[in-house]
Amino acid sequence: MFNDLLYRQYGLHIHHAQHALTGAGSDTWLLTCTEGDYVLKFPASGAIDHPEAEPKLCAFLRRHDIPACAFLKNHTGGYLSLDSDGRMFTVQQRFPGHTPDWNSASEALLLESAELLGKIHAVLQAYPTLPEGIGAGFFARMTPQRALESYRRSVAAALRLGDTESAADLNWRIGLIARFPTWQFDLNRLTCRNTHGDYFISQFLCKDGHLTAVIDWTSACVHPVIWEVMRSFVYAAPCCADGSIDRSLLARYVHAYCRYGTLSDYDLENLDRLYFYQIAVCDYYGQYYASTAANRHIYLQQAKHATRLLQSAF
């Protein structure tokens, strides 16, 4: 499928190409070539994705001992290439290891990933400021009222498709919005840092129970650090699969993060609140119904995972 394209632009001889099943939005292929193992990626084209910035950022991270992707240059000396349809793509060296399933991390891997996240935040303080992630724009756009309107549209879409289970989830969320706490977040008091932007277990490569790499830095941005701390925990810890949160394990996770990262009292006070707010006002069900991506089912999995957490908390 890609033999001529990759040979002309990179001089690679492909023996085998396997479609990657993880990751939402992007179209990713694992390549076995005469020259080695590589990853061919057609990145998502959303507003939060910045594939043009990824090679430089990853080179900086590798210089500071963060196991990030190494990109190949094409025949013109650039990192970004186009196929015959005008789709942008990159080629990266492939790290050894596999991507674990959600909520399957051992405690050792869980704490190792927390420590690495703290190190990423510390290292990236020396990098130029990245685009805004969860910030003032997010809170202006993503309000409970707008979530309510989106959920009502998604209920209608679910019922049209006969998806009664998702319709029930959405109706529960509509009820939640009516009684949701009136939390306010002071961005000037939250610790915000340059970060991966989408740091969780689906972006890990692991071998022998340890991290070998963190992949997919296309959505790197500035986030409140507690959002990424909490999100990475709830997708990795086995206890969270049914929506439960082991507070003792979460405390150990935060402690491991703080080996390199820093959290204020205000951060800790809002650790749960900020994440719960974000998953309450973001309509992943709507993303699923609107998407045409081959792997759009991941949006539905994210939606149901978030709903279980909210149902357990509220």
Question: What are the residue ranges of the model-derived segments?
Answer:
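An alpha-helical support segment within catalytic cores of ATP-dependent transferases
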Residues: F2-D4, T129, E149-G197
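ATP-binding glycine-rich phosphate-binding loop
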Residues: Q9-T32
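ATP-binding pocket architecture of kinase catalytic cores
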Residues: C33-P131
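Active-site activation/catalytic loop segments of kinase-like enzymes and analogous catalytic loops
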Residues: I226-T262, F276-A293
